[in-house]
Amino acid sequence: MAKKFNYKLPSMVALTLFGTAFTAHQANAAEQPQNQSNHKNVLDDQTALKQAEKAKSEVTQSTTNVSGTQTYQDPTQVQPKQDTQSTTYDASLDEMSTYNEISSNQKQQSLSTDDANQNQTNSVTKNQQEETNDLTQEDKTSTDTNQLQETQSVAKENEKDLGANANNEQQDKKMTASQPSENQAIETQTASNDNESQQKSQQVTSEQNETATPKVSNTNASGYNFDYDDEDDDSSTDHLEPISLNNVNATSKQTTSYKYKEPAQRVTTNTVKKETASNQATIDTKQFTPFSATAQPRTVYSVSSQKTSSLPKYTPKVNSSINNYIRKKNMKAPRIEEDYTSYFPKYGYRNGVGRPEGIVVHDTANDNSTIDGEIAFMKRNYTNAFVHAFVDGNRIIETAPTDYLSWGAGPYGNQRFINVEIVHTHDYDSFARSMNNYADYAATQLQYYNLKPDSAENDGRGTVWTHAAISNFLGGTDHADPHQYLRSHNYSYAELYDLIYEKYLIKTKQVAPWGTTSTKPSQPSKPSGGTNNKLTVSANRGVAQIKPTNNGLYTTVYDSKGHKTDQVQKTLSVTKTATLGNNKFYLVEDYNSGKKYGWVKQGDVVYNTAKAPVKVNQTYNVKAGSTLYTVPWGTPKQVASKVSGTGNQTFKATKQQQIDKATYLYGTVNGKSGWISKYYLTTASKPSNPTKPSTNNQLTVTNNSGVAQINAKNSGLYTTVYDTKGKTTNQIQRTLSVTKAATLGDKKFYLVGDYNTGTNYGWVKQDEVIYNTAKSPVKINQTYNVKPGVKLHTVPWGTYNQVAGTVSGKGDQTFKATKQQQIDKATYLYGTVNGKSGWISKYYLTAPSKVQALSTQSTPAPKQVKPSTQTVNQIAQVKANNSGIRASVYDKTAKSGTKYANRTFLINKQRTQGNNTYVLLQDGTSNTPLGWVNINDVTTQNIGKQTQSIGKYSVKPTNNGLYSIAWGTKNQQLLAPNTLANQAFNASKAVYVGKDLYLYGTVNNRTGWIAAKDLIQNSTDAQSTPYNYTFVINNSKSYFYMDPTKANRYSLKPYYEQTFTVIKQKNINGVKWYYGQLLDGKYVWIKSTDLVKEKIKYAYTGMTLNNAINIQSRLKYKPQVQNEPLKWSNANYSQIKNAMDTKRLANDSSLKYQFLRLDQPQYLSAQALNKLLKGKGVLENQGAAFSQAARKYGLNEIYLISHALVETGNGTSQLAKGGDVSKGKFTTKTGHKYHNVFGIGAFDNNALVDGIKYAKNAGWTSVSKAIIGGAKFIGNSYVKAGQNTLYKMRWNPANPGTHQYATDINWANVNAQVLKQFYDKIGEVGKYFEIPTYK
């Protein structure tokens, strides 16, 4: 969009740095504010994960029968008691769909049973208005209630005459009735057969006008009863037959006639019933649909009076005895159990969260395992592989939310599909059940995600895959399951797919469910009532208190009457809102336990909104006698305790939650915990009178496992914490390991050491380091892509002093990671790329893609990676305690590694076998391979290439000795240190081990390696080594030299704060010198102490941070934050503080770029800038123009480029490509072209014409002229206006609350991260920073 440039930086900056959706609201910002709601921000995707997962969790239970859907039996709907007026449980309520109740006119049928021994009286009573079901039984000889049994018989079709009734013969089958309990209906299906000696004939002679259909609670879409005990009785099915019960005292014939409105077809069925008691039955028919991701009326299957369906029967595509067995047994799928693990990672699929593209069939390949054993093993080894679900003959257990990918089918399959494992079974029936369960689960997932079944087995395209198909068509894995396992049971994937396909058609009501007869149903009548019964359900996150006068709690919102509750005047959580017609309800539950109580009418509660609780760590004062509650906004019925003591007591808060406009905190005071309103708390203040200095010198020491970087300004390292003065250290601004923390009186220390070798350096004061927590490293085996120019470090969270190397090459390079460690909230991976090894932040890594970029998210390990040998270039010291050495990585046992312990060896190969990674040790002198050792048994460093380095040195009096190998141990020492003092050393070659240089040469007639730091080079023989880096000159009072060994020198004052590009370095008498180019082109020598990696200035604001935050909080346009996707809300105090705290921001390697000075050119080369401009339309190869513009007008090159990329749509806009204006209209046909790459003068009402006019008047006849000329306008109008950093643009610390370019508190953070990404892309870093400081 073109911008109006009549104002200060408006929304241009808000859009300058890609991907931000933050609007400027201030008076001096854009005249046309942006519509925030229309922006899609990548930051919102992470917040949306919770919503996607929550939506998916609404449907987690499979139906209990083959034709059912994923009808969710949610605990939010308490089951009603079964009584003579039974209510119907509505499983759709929690699926947030609508429910339609349809009443139908039913034809009634009379069935009489010939039974000479039966003297019971059967009668039918129908209540046409209530449509309720009364089952009563009378038995004069027994007080027990008999159980109604219904016997279904298979109907035969007579096709001789479609216009007339057909006669069928049917045989009776003897049955035995059972009486398990009252008010239950057990139905028994009896097939028509010829295995009985007695045969009776029935003929349809009349049609009846009354229908008796028992009403059954807890029914699902296909009319089956829910089996809450998960018991599968194959001799009984859950269908209801339409029957009429007539009084019969003697042998008689019973006839039933069905009339359907289906053209030219009549189906007549005969049934035989045996009754054990006198019964009355009245029928209610309800219809509802399976769950769908889109809202639809629920009008599908009905619990009809007979096993009939208007849908056609499914015709199997393959002949399968097992599938026929499943159909014949009418197998039910069990409920889907959830066994999620909190520490499993959650990554979106390549199309986003909640968007899988299909499902993959796996088998566990383990004949001896169980489903519980498989899941337990997976949880222990989830870093190698984990899947979404396991299925066996009895259970379906979902182990990971299907809205997120899993690691089960290789990197390409993981990005796309749901992975489900079949656990091995061993008998025919169990195997059939497992196939039924898998097919039901697969069909449910396809239906849920609106995917149609399509086998990918033969063409690699579809929604149903085997692991073998993934291997064949996508790659990244070599597995071939589940074919071998299926064949072992005389089954095939084609049969399984056919079952999945049939299940899907049943669930989507395209074919008739199992156990039904295909026929046209009776026409439904209009709803009996005029009330709007549409149900809508939405998620809610509030709290409520039930009023003393209320209508009670409702089990379902369809209940006509609520039941009494003891939760009156208690604060309860509200999780859902439901509307049914004119009635509105809240679903309430216990705040702490989550126990569901039921639905309550909205008019019966006092309701308040509630934000999610957040963790805090704050201390307050609270008066004695104050009340603590078990819940926030608690009532007298929810008192936890009273604050004891007298006067103010210390309350330590750990949680905070906002209820409406009030804030409640949870914490502990005097050993008692609970919630209290912030109104009753005051901030703990320091004593007004100075206290006497503490004389407590008690020492406490604790173990620690963190990392730290020593600040440039420090008091040194302490040998013991009792030392009064520290020693100067060269370990500043390096990442060190922290192994212990100590407190001595009011002083606190960390014990720091080398991260890789474990060598302790000493104690450092805690306030003189930047400290981060660190988890233990874990072994991994993953492959990523990394851009050239990215730095590898010798340690995780490494600094510029710990660079191991730079990624070389063009385009994405393959990074093979073997270790992973979490530092604070960031993840670092150790691995190898192009022969170089080191640590890289996961931020710079992306998952490899096969053909196209699948996702910007890093997708970790495939299920099992094929072993491969990598070439590495490292050196290692074998630990004293090791697991031995192997001749081959395949050896199950290792030989003793004692003789290799505490020795240094070269490593040139690395291989992962199973869950272990091994390295090949090589003798450093003979280059002979020695054997493989586990990578955990060695300490490794990168080793450089040996180079010729001829020179003469003297060995320092204090040295470490001469060794047979660089970085050797005492076991490899050739000459002791005391024999080398002040001796001449003649060097012939050199090599770097990590950051340390070692020289190879001769001393005292012995030849070996010695550390360069132990040598003093003769001034006439100083040797230089290549070194490439750009420094900033930081000492205006020092000098540069044409020859560092001579006295001639020249002042650095004219070059102060300019960049100095180094090409080589050397040490002369212990002083490091750099040789490079000044900005005026001179090549000179400068001492390292006169240079800095980056120039940081601090600007004092004159106010406290709290004062600045209070000013921001009182603005008319409040600072904004997105706690939920696309929903802006006022940021709270802690959120604003977090965004404004310059100390915190400056310590973050990415966020500190909001302090980058945009008014300071960095003098980057045109070649480097062209890397950012590759493929950017007319801006491609314009690096020289941007470099010239930046230098000429004093602007940061990266900022200038990012500005142009946004305004030109990556160099593709017509305004950038150029044109002319003729007769007030834009044209490209005049032969003249004028370009505008910053949208200057391009007003919204006619942006193209106005922008070209401006360019024409300015004479911008080329893209380069437009860049240079436009930069002048940008510099003078915006950056030079005083707010020369992103932080200043957002918060304006010089005058808080005025002239701020955005209201979003994260605006500067996000833009800073984008700037950092640009620098990383070209392998550079920012050089000039200005950080405001508060009192």
Swiss-Prot record:
Reaction catalysed by this enzyme: Hydrolyzes the link between N-acetylmuramoyl residues and L-amino acid residues in certain cell-wall glycopeptides; an N(4)-(oligosaccharide-(1->3)-[oligosaccharide-(1->6)]-beta-D-Man-(1->4)-beta-D-GlcNAc-(1->4)-alpha-D-GlcNAc)-L-asparaginyl-[protein] + H2O = an oligosaccharide-(1->3)-[oligosaccharide-(1->6)]-beta-D-Man-(1->4)-D-GlcNAc + N(4)-(N-acetyl-beta-D-glucosaminyl)-L-asparaginyl-[protein]
Locations listed in the record: Secreted
PTM comment text: Undergoes proteolytic processing to generate the two extracellular lytic enzymes, probably at the septal region on the cell surface.
Enzyme class per UniProt: hydrolase
Cytoplasm listed as a keyword: no
EC number in record: 3.5.1.28, 3.2.1.96
Protein family (similarity comment): In the N-terminal section; belongs to the N-acetylmuramoyl-L-alanine amidase 2 family. In the C-terminal section; belongs to the glycosyl hydrolase 73 family.
Polar residues bias locations: 58-88, 100-127, 143-155, 176-223, 244-258
Signal peptide: 1-29
Free-text note on domains in this protein's UniProt record: The GW domains are responsible for directing the proteins to the septal region.
Protein name from the UniProt record: Bifunctional autolysin
Biological role stated in the UniProt entry: Endohydrolysis of the di-N-acetylchitobiosyl unit in high-mannose glycopeptides and glycoproteins containing the -[(Man)5(GlcNAc)2]-Asn structure. One N-acetyl-D-glucosamine residue remains attached to the protein; the rest of the oligosaccharide is released intact. Cleaves the peptidoglycan connecting the daughter cells at the end of the cell division cycle, resulting in the separation of the two newly divided cells. Acts as an autolysin in penicillin-induced lysis. As a bacterial surface-associated protein, mediates attachment to polystyrene surfaces, contributing to biofilm formation.
Positions of the UniProt region annotated as Endo-beta-N-acetylglucosaminidase: 864-1335
Subunit structure of this chain's protein: Oligomer; forms a ring structure at the cell surface which is important for efficient partitioning of daughter cells after cell division.
Membrane spanning residue stretches: none
InterPro entries, alphabetized: Amidase/PGRP_sf, Amidase_domain, GW_dom, GW_dom_sf, MGlyc_endo_b_GlcNAc-like_dom
Any single Gene Ontology cellular-component annotation: extracellular region
Every GW domain range: 533-610, 612-686, 700-774, 776-850, 868-943, 945-1020, 1023-1096
Record keywords, A-Z: Cell wall biogenesis/degradation, Hydrolase, Multifunctional enzyme, Repeat, Secreted, Signal
Bias kind Low complexity: ranges: 515-531
Gene3D superfamilies linked to this entry: 2.30.30.170, Peptidoglycan recognition protein-like (3.40.80.10)
Region annotation (Disordered) ranges: 51-88, 100-262, 514-535
Organism per entry: Staphylococcus epidermidis
